Amino acid sequence: MKALHFGAGNIGRGFIGKLLADAGAQLTFADVNQPLLDALNKRKRYQVNVVGEQARVEEVKNVSAVNSGSPEVVALIAEADIVTTAVGPQILARIAATVAQGLITRHQQGNTRPLNIIACENMVRGTSQLKQHVFAALSEDEQIWVEQHVGFVDSAVDRIVPPSEAGSTDILAVTVETFSEWIVDGTQFKGQPPEIVGMELTDNLMAFVERKLFTLNTGHAITAYLGQLAGHQTIRDAILDPAVRQTVKGAMEESGAVLIKRYAFDPQKHAAYINKILSRFENPYLHDDVERVGRQPLRKLSAGDRLIKPLLGTLEYQLPHDSLVTGIAAAMSYRSEQDPQAQELVTLLAQLGPKAALAQISGLPADSEVVEQAVSVYNAMQQKLAH
């Protein structure tokens, strides 16, 4: 199995790339970070530190790397059996032209073996969005050929992979938690789905996508935002603060009530899933910084993301949402000198005021009760910070 993975960052190396390599794939990473590519090509291997109760070091072998802007990538797509990505939602559109060129070359070479493309991003149906960008760069004839021979497979991914420790001397080493979940839409494959241990097939992907988004992502973000407000440095410190924990757990229970209503989840099993996630946030071996987890607040406050989407579900089913609203107010309070979106958020709040700013970012009606509530909590948070 020939595999090409876009994104040689921590998630690429520590999660998706690792599962592909473990499955015996001939794996090539595509990235723009030249020192990283040089190190991968020189060593052909790297270490993954799996941390938890039983820490272990695993080695990923027989890997290579190419620059994602190079002609080699096009040639690899023309030959690959599987193409995966972990580049971040914003970058997906940027790699689409390269993917399209690879598919055109594949067509020209007469390669009719099935190819499956799986975007492994923190977004809802990311591969379907990638497909739209790719198809925009294809002629009608090429689109027809691609529809026949290429599967665009949506997925849900879950593994906490913090950045490398400061002072780490090995550019390739990566630290990951023990837990990992990669769920793919089994209905979207062309040909037989590849056998990859750790990749689960489902015919009801949206239930898993929203379960993860509404629980892990919602909880992680709110832990970060409330943690920063309370002066905590790491996710672990924040979630061990009883006040933060109460709101985070409350928000996950509120979003969970939406999932139970929408997908008929078992309430007891979902409660256990929430507790499992809280224990993952407490992992003493993961040093995950609240400022890192909170970054890109404009994206995280957008209509389809981890804060507003579950809130919209509570409004749809007339369910409680006080903790989610507190989380939204905390996201509005996020500040970071390192994050351009945090700077933009501050500008919007100053120019428009909190009410109009939240409405513009989230798509919620400015005069809605829920926006009034979020602004009221936000103002109280700002007053508290001022004293």
Curated annotation (Swiss-Prot):
It catalyses: D-mannitol 1-phosphate + NAD(+) = beta-D-fructose 6-phosphate + NADH + H(+). The keyword Oxidoreductase applies. NAD(+) binds at A3, L4, H5, F6, G7, A8, G9, N10, I11, G12, R13, G14. One of its GO terms (cellular component) is cytosol. Transmembrane segments: none annotated. Keywords: NAD, Oxidoreductase. Its EC number is 1.1.1.17. It comes from the Bacteria. GO terms for biological process: mannitol catabolic process. GO terms for molecular function: mannitol-1-phosphate 5-dehydrogenase activity. Pfam families: Mannitol_dh (PF01232), Mannitol_dh_C (PF08125). It is an enzyme of class 1 (oxidoreductase). PROSITE patterns: MANNITOL_DHGENASE. Belongs to the mannitol dehydrogenase family. PANTHER family: ALTRONATE OXIDOREDUCTASE-RELATED, MANNITOL-1-PHOSPHATE 5-DEHYDROGENASE. This is Mannitol-1-phosphate 5-dehydrogenase. The lineage of its organism: Bacteria, Pseudomonadati, Pseudomonadota, Gammaproteobacteria, Enterobacterales.
